[in-house]
């Protein structure tokens, strides 16, 4: 769910998932049957604060990306459309990824578009960069879910990129549905 209203009681709405229920006359009316948890709920109190969201806008300066790679372990790039790297940033992304990949830096591609999610496979530049660096892609996860999950996983898996990537794609309470 994503917070869509600032002051209303019905502030949250489902994104890329059907509405589960509503409250009417003090009762919960479920649209989908209740599904019990597969495992007990766990709480993670130790998280990494070294995650940064970088929202691309037209004219974004490449040196910002260099600064973020220097100062954060994980950068979530919120890109345009299905999620790709603009030509103006491509050289910087390659340079920074080559420079930092051995030190366990994580780059995640997301989209600024709320519905349907990202798909880096649509355009050649997205295909290439995803393949070259085994980038993690957010697909249909909300930005809030992406950031929260990464904060937990960075603390758990640290520099083990493969383990972190595998855990990222493991579905938690329907947070990711369309990972390819």
Question: Would you name each region that the model predicts?
Answer:
Residues 1-82, 87-89, 171-180:
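Accessory alpha-helical/coil subdomains and C-terminal extensions
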Residues 82-180:
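C-terminal non-catalytic interaction/assembly regions of soluble proteins
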């Amino acid at each position: 769910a994503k917070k869509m209203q600032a002051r209303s009681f019905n502030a949250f709405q489902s994104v890329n998932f059907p509405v589960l229920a509503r409250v009417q006359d003090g009762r919960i009316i479920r649209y989908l049957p209740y599904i019990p948890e597969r495992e007990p709920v766990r709480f993670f109190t130790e998280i990494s604060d070294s995650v940064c969201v970088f929202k691309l806008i037209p004219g974004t300066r490449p040196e910002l990306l260099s600064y973020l790679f220097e100062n954060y372990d994980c950068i979530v790039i919120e890109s345009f459309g299905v999620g790709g790297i603009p030509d103006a940033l491509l050289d910087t992304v390659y340079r920074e990824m080559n420079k930092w990949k051995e030190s366990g830096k994580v780059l995640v591609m997301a989209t600024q578009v709320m519905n349907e999610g990202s798909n880096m496979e649509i355009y050649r530049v997205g295909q290439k960069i995803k393949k070259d660096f085994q980038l993690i892609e957010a697909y249909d996860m909300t930005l809030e879910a992406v950031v929260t999950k990464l904060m937990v996983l960075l603390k758990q898996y640290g520099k083990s990129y493969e383990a972190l990537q595998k855990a990222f794609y493991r579905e938690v309470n329907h947070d990711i549905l369309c990972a390819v």
